């Protein structure tokens, strides 16, 4: 048996201050659930041997997973144009939160085909799972300039922190108790 459900929500409001300046935010939320159960019965199937474990007359298994994601990107965008010059400045911040939890269970020899559920009393039982949460937060700025659409220059800078950096980080800038990486670019 398989049950799968998903929910997504995305909102992106925008406010125009004038024809050159606007602010916008993108908010996204996703929830995903996955539940699976399987059963190999005793009746109609042969007993099988599991290497290094033993003989199995039937098998019950279950898998459950839930993933929850949250994303937000808020920015302000300013553009200047005249006959020869074009300049665009963008600055904002992003936040990401992702949480994934799963469990997998398996057991053998339920005793009869009327008890297809996984329980602690089954032979050769195996249980595993994952519980992973990570977050990241970034400030960013970008500047694009061109002269008569012939000569271009672009520069950007982002400052990001994430739980994936870990706690034993020596590089970057330490602010508010966490380490931030600086990522400049020019082209």
Residue ranges and their predicted role:
Residues 1, 38-58, 99-127:
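Surface-exposed loop/turn segments flanking beta-strands in extracellular/periplasmic regions
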């Amino acid at each position: 048996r398989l049950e799968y459900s998903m929910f997504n929500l995305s909102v992106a409001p925008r406010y125009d201050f004038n024809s050159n300046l606007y602010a916008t935010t993108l908010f996204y939320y996703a929830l995903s659930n996955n539940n699976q159960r399987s059963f190999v019965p005793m009746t109609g199937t042969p007993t099988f041997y599991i290497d290094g474990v033993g003989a199995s007359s039937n098998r019950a298994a279950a898998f459950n997973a839930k993933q929850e994601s949250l994303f937000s990107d808020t920015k302000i965008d300013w553009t200047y144009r005249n006959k020869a010059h074009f300049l665009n400045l963008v600055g904002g911040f992003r936040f990401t939160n992702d949480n994934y939890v799963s469990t997998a269970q398996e057991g053998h020899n339920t005793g009869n085909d009327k008890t297809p559920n996984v329980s602690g009393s089954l032979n050769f039982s195996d249980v595993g799972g994952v519980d992973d949460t990570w977050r990241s937060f970034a400030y960013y700025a970008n500047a694009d300039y061109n002269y008569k659409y012939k000569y271009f220059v672009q520069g950007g800078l982002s400052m990001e922190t994430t739980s994936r950096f870990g706690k034993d980080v020596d590089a970057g800038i330490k602010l508010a108790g966490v380490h931030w990486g600086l990522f400049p670019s020019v082209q």
